[in-house]
Structure formats: structure tokens, C-alpha cells
């Protein structure tokens, strides 16, 4: 039986300071590598397997997402998913870009997912990294299922590679937990999440967070002149 509230612990995200190298890549099963649209040769030389990356990027089609797929020369044969982007893209575009790269990286058995953003200004780097972490958190959290055996997770954990500083991800994690809760509740069927169950969910969240909780019946909504809420409430048989 599915619980009404999901576990919101989320994926483990480990930042790794220092230059991206063969050792750090070898600790991942899949790696998402984001580069500028036209990466300079000097940048590619600093990245392990840069020669193979350059060759793969030459074969890409314009606008393809991902731009290239290759394998690292290590024991895990790390799948490297390369995406190219330009600074100044809107938040929605960055998230859409990140989701496409995540989809390409999670076709294999779940493992340690590496994420590296290289060759950008600090601001552009942070924006792209946040979008990729948000997409990974969304992809790696379970949703309600009605099967005897739960589907395997697509990601076990996340490592952020090639960082100059520890990223500020508290907001990204909080938004991911909120989005996960909303998606979870949306997917519960009406026979599981009826009016009373929804109220109990709201009360449980309020108790956990130390918030006040009050439930209004239709008579009270009429007194308050809350027409929009009243219209919704009148569609339910339970007052």
C-alpha cells in the first residue's frame, strides 16, 4: 500500500572540489559534461579523453541534445553524455536542456552520476549546475506505484566534479522536495487521496513544520466570501 506522503530524503549529492581528472571520472558510472557551444582546444586538453570528445563533437548535428555520447577509458567504461550550451539562456531552457541530458544518462543501470560544467563564467556555471542538480533530483526520486515490485531507481547518488568552490544548493534541494511532494500527491488516485485524506496530509505537514492548521467547512467559506474556494469545496460530498 502506498503511503499518502513520500519520503523526502532525496538523493545524496556530493560536491568534489578540484580539477576534473581521470580518477574522479572513474568513480562515476555516468557523467554529464556540459561545455560551451564552441569549446576551445585548451579546455578540451584539460579534460581526460579530450581528444575523443573533440572528435565526437565534430560529428554532432547542430542543436542536438545531447551533443555527443562517448565512453571514458576506465574500468567502469563510464558513459559520458556531452551537452553544449551558451550563457544567458532562460531558466526554463536550462531545465529543459538538463532533462534531456539526464534522460540520455539514465538509460543504463542505476549508478553514481557525475555532473561537470566546464568552460563558463562563474554565473553561467552556477546556473547550469543548479539546473542539472534539479533535474537529477527530480529523476532520482520515486513516485507512487501499484506494483508488487517497485521500479529500480535511475540514480543512486550524484557527484559534482571539477568545482572551484562548494555550490549553494539549499534552495535547489528545497524546491526539489516541494516538487516531489506535489508530483506524488497529483499521482495518487481519488480513492486514496479523498477530501479527508488530503486534510490529514496537510495537517501532518503542518505538525511536522510547526505551522498552524485550520480546516474550513462550506458554511465558514460562505461567511468569509471565499467564492473560488467555495466553488471547489461544493464539488465534494464531504463538507
Give the ranges of each region predicted by the language model:
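Short amphipathic alpha-helical segment within the helicase RecA-like ATPase core
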Residues: 1-239
Amino acid at each position: 500500500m502506498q503511503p499518502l506522503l513520500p519520503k523526502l530524503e532525496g538523493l545524496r549529492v556530493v560536491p568534489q572540489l578540484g580539477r576534473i581528472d581521470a580518477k574522479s571520472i572513474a568513480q562515476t558510472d555516468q557523467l554529464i559534461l556540459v561545455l560551451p557551444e564552441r569549446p576551445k582546444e585548451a579546455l578540451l586538453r584539460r579534460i581526460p579523453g579530450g581528444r575523443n570528445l573533440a572528435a565526437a563533437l565534430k560529428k554532432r548535428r547542430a542543436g542536438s541534445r545531447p551533443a555527443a555520447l562517448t565512453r571514458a577509458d576506465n574500468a567502469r567504461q563510464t558513459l559520458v553524455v556531452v551537452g553544449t550550451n551558451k550563457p544567458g539562456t532562460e531558466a526554463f531552457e536550462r531545465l529543459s536542456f538538463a532533462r534531456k541530458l539526464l534522460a540520455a544518462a539514465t538509460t543504463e543501470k542505476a549508478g553514481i552520476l557525475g555532473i561537470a560544467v566546464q568552460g563558463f563564467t562563474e554565473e553561467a556555471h552556477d546556473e547550469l549546475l543548479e539546473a542539472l542538480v534539479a533535474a537529477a533530483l527530480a529523476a532520482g526520486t520515486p513516485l507512487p506505484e501499484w506494483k508488487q515490485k517497485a521500479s529500480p531507481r535511475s540514480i543512486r547518488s550524484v557527484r559534482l566534479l571539477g568545482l572551484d568552490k562548494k555550490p549553494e544548493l539549499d534552495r535547489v534541494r528545497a524546491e526539489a522536495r516541494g516538487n516531489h511532494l506535489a508530483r506524488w500527491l497529483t499521482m495518487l488516485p481519488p480513492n486514496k487521496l479523498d477530501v479527508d485524506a488530503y486534510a490529514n496530509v496537510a495537517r501532518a505537514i503542518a505538525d511536522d513544520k510547526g505551522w498552524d492548521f485550520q480546516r474550513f467547512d462550506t458554511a465558514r467559506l460562505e461567511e468569509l466570501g471565499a467564492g473560488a474556494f467555495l466553488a471547489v469545496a461544493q464539488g465534494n460530498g464531504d463538507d
